[in-house]
Amino acid sequence: MSKKVKKEKKPTDKLADKTLTTKVLQGIFGDPEKRELKRMEKIVQGINKLEPKYQAMSDDELKDQTNLLKKQLLELRKKADAKTALEKQKLEKESSKKTKKTSAKTIDTKKAEDKILDQLLPDAFALVREATFRILGMRHFDVQMIGGIALHEGNVAEMKTGEGKTLVALLPSYLNALTERGVHVVTVNDYLAQRDAGWNAPVFHFLGLNVGVIIADASFLYDPEYINEEHADERMQHLKPCTRKQAYAADVTYGTNNEFGFDYLRDNMVNEVDFLRQRELNFAIVDEVDSILIDEARTPLIISAPAGDNPDSYYQFAKIVSKLTPEDYVLDEKHKSVTLTDQGIEKVQRLLGIDNLYSAENSRLVYHLDQALRAQVVFNRDRDYVVTNSGEVIIVDEHTGRLMHGRRYNEGLHQAIEAKEGVAVKEESMTLATISFQNFFRLYRKLSGMTGTAFTEAEEFQQIYALNVIQIPPNRPIKRIDKDDLIFRTEAGKLRAIVRTVQEYHAKGQPILVGSASIVKNELIAKYLDEAKLPYEILNAKNNEREAAIVAKAGEKGAITLATNMAGRGTDIKLPEEVKKLGGLVVIGSERHDSRRVDNQLRGRGGRQGDPGITQFFVSCEDDLMRIFQGNQLANILRFVGLDEDTPIHNRAVTKNLEAAQRRIEGFNFDSRKNVVQYDNVINRHRRVVYLMRRKILEGENISQEIKRLMKEATVDLTIESSRVNKKFKQNFLQVFNIDPDLVETIGAMRKPEDRAKLALTAVSEAYANQELEFGPEVMRRIEREVYLKVLDALWMQHLENMQHLREGIHWRSIGQRDPLVEYRTESQKLFEGLQKNLREEVLKILLSVTKQEAVVTDIVDGEEYDTELTQMAETATNKGVNTIDSGVKNLDNEFKSGSSKKTDVNRERNTARKSKKKQRQNKKHSKR
């Protein structure tokens, strides 16, 4: 019997597939990137001509330029608005003509706004350049001006290490801040957000703009009069604590990608307009953009609450899988997956005492088994995670080598690893709100980014974010020498060669940086250097608190530094003059990473700002990348020709094969990220509808029209069938609307659907009018608003859970030759329609049944009011608590789920304020009595 075998889709081989086509097109039309650079160079020439004008100004005159530019912006806006109004009138006239040639034109307000800023750009950039020189003593190079233009125009600017990206961000930030709509400068961690803000804030302050900072659990405003002497770094001493709302109201706000995203979610959970933190999402400049938008692209931000699962099952299955042998399972290292063999299934069934592991009643056992097996076989300690002395399992970022505090693997995997390591298992959690970085950053009106390594991901930036990558030329030519890879037969031979190379350069006095992909390999190299009695500093996620001190000395004469990928990003190793004369920093890569970007980041530590330097990678056939992608074949060939362990080969073909393997992995990851965003786009549409609906209710004082709309929809829905057809007509109707049962029978007996709907709506409207008379219009409006928000929040949380369950099982549809994505879209639409139906019915049921005894909404005291029973009533109806949450990050790339060990009360500010006001007013009432 033949079987249909579905061919596996090959991963996208980015760049390689399009090389020939690109070359042909460039031959005909020229290189578009070069054309862009030439265009920007002309703009810079215009900026340079303005330099003498601003140099001649006094400080006071320079400060006044911001107000003058804002006035100029307003004038240009008025002209643009007038032009837009005329165009709209013209379009309306065209569309009103019933001809075949209807106008398809639309007014692009974003483009119009950017055109206005383009006119101000030369003066704004020249002004910032002069102000920066006066305040910081640094003048923007022409290439930095080009970088600023690229960012303003919504591109990714690739700028090499040491080219001054922090200073470049000043230029577009200032220009776009003139609109008074806010600018967000996004960094990867709290330290960089504070450091960069503290560095640039004096320039913004000099020019009359204020700067805010958003980090985890804190927010600041730059104030030169404020001094916090506890900060050792002078750049951070003037950051004055403030509310989050004040920090977001600043002209320019620095912060981390996590906190910007979390605050967006938190704003869509508040019940009072006053507790909203963010303004509109206008313009974002993302530093290390490849890290945030590519490496963390499949990283949903999650606000979650404990779900209270029993941890005993995790310990039970950790014990079971520890008894399995390699013959009991098949490990797929390429896809990081593991499956049981028939022998393994039989062994597990014996250990569990069951006959059929995969029967329906054992689905929960399969869930625990899968995660325990992955924890045991796929995930390794000191490579994928570390275990602290306090017994906490912390994930290690595979791209940066840093510890990812507050992040947890999802779907029970983190708990399975905790059980494997014998530490306390933390409970699972339920999702309250979530959004991926892909969809969050696409909410911004304009998006741009900068990094040292983006070109290899140019296709993904364009396809997912509509961002073009522009390679900004360095200010000084690169003198670094990148040597060919050395390939060894065994890892031991490779490590001995690394030691010999380190000894050679160390004898000359050159500083050496040895990079590795994991803590395990990092510590293994350290053992080899110990045997050779070579002094070194070691940097990995276990001692990251010493990072600044180690990096500060890494460029000194004779320094040897062993580092994981931590040293590849965000570090700037500066060299003294004597080291430059010796040949600069020597960078040794102890293996190739899955991603070419990570390799390029390591290379980029050497040769900064035109400094000399040498880089070289040492590779063995036993390295993961080589071993997985046919490294054994090469090892056999080397053994056959009699090559010993310590003799390397210089073979460009092997290096090209390695790079091809990297491209295949990158292509696979790209396809995977595209797949994730296709699924995430489905729930993103639901999210946008719900959040828009929620914001309208939150900001609207009177939502009675919305309630009337719900009543009309609900009555039509409930009266489609008569009571003759639907025997549960009366029961279903009374479950939603608390009205006279006899009248419901009359409605159900009517023949025509429109007659049933009309009478039902009249009856329900009368009942609702009676409710309003009972409470009074003002109180009724507050009841409507509070109930609507509470029910919507509860149903949205349930919807997120339902969507997650749907997503987890949808891939099985492919067995029936059905497209899982199409099925997911269809099923999710049904779920969303169910949410809308339940929203109507739950809101109306509560509003028509609530009594004064059940819910005293407000108590007026001297013209003020406070909430009493309403919140309890709504929460009882929804049976959901939204008080204590975890903030963290879920990463589908490596199955991450957030869950910060630190609990955060999402309603803390609101509840504290309410309790305080309530107590004060009660005291007033008692004193009056």
Show which residues each predicted segment covers:
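Extended, charged helical/alpha-beta scaffold domains that provide interaction surfaces
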Residues: V386, G391-I394, R402-R407, Q609, ...
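Conserved P-loop NTPase motor core
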Residues: S2-G642, L692, R709, E713
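Short, Lys/Arg-enriched, disordered terminal segments
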Residues: M1-V5, H926-R929
